[in-house]
Amino acid sequence: MSDRLTDDEIQAQLPAAWDRDGDEIVRTFEFESYLEGVGFASAAGGLAEEAFHHPEMTIGWREVEVRLTTHDAGGITQKDIDLAERFDELAE
């Protein structure tokens, strides 16, 4: 199990485009089309499966909201920060 990060650690490490929402970090990725968003969600799901760390993803019209938390730790851990960074790279 991963250890929860402190508030200071979260603030220092949170990727720029992500926000904190309680015990989760969240980002809405925007795309040119609905299908581009679906493709991103599928690829992000593959990365999540590789990391064995599964986010909540909501697919909307030309956007995908991603929420990350570590349930067994009861909050935000390094796993969340690391996966957020991988999703950012995927979206570039």
Curated annotation (Swiss-Prot):
GO function terms (MF aspect): 4-alpha-hydroxytetrahydrobiopterin dehydratase activity
InterPro entries: PCD_sf, Pterin_deHydtase
Reactions that this protein is recorded to catalyse: (4aS,6R)-4a-hydroxy-L-erythro-5,6,7,8-tetrahydrobiopterin = (6R)-L-erythro-6,7-dihydrobiopterin + H2O
Any one biological process term the GO annotation gives: tetrahydrobiopterin biosynthetic process
Origin: domain of life: Archaea
Entry's EC annotation: 4.2.1.96
Coiled-coil regions listed in the entry: none
Top class in the EC scheme: lyase
Gene3D superfamilies cross-referenced by the UniProt entry: Transcriptional coactivator/pterin dehydratase
Keywords: Lyase
PANTHER family reported in the protein's UniProt record: PTERIN-4-ALPHA-CARBINOLAMINE DEHYDRATASE
HAMAP family per record: Pterin_4_alpha
Family: Belongs to the pterin-4-alpha-carbinolamine dehydratase family.
Protein name: Putative pterin-4-alpha-carbinolamine dehydratase
Species this protein is from: Natronomonas pharaonis (strain ATCC 35678 / DSM 2160 / CIP 103997 / JCM 8858 / NBRC 14720 / NCIMB 2260 / Gabara)
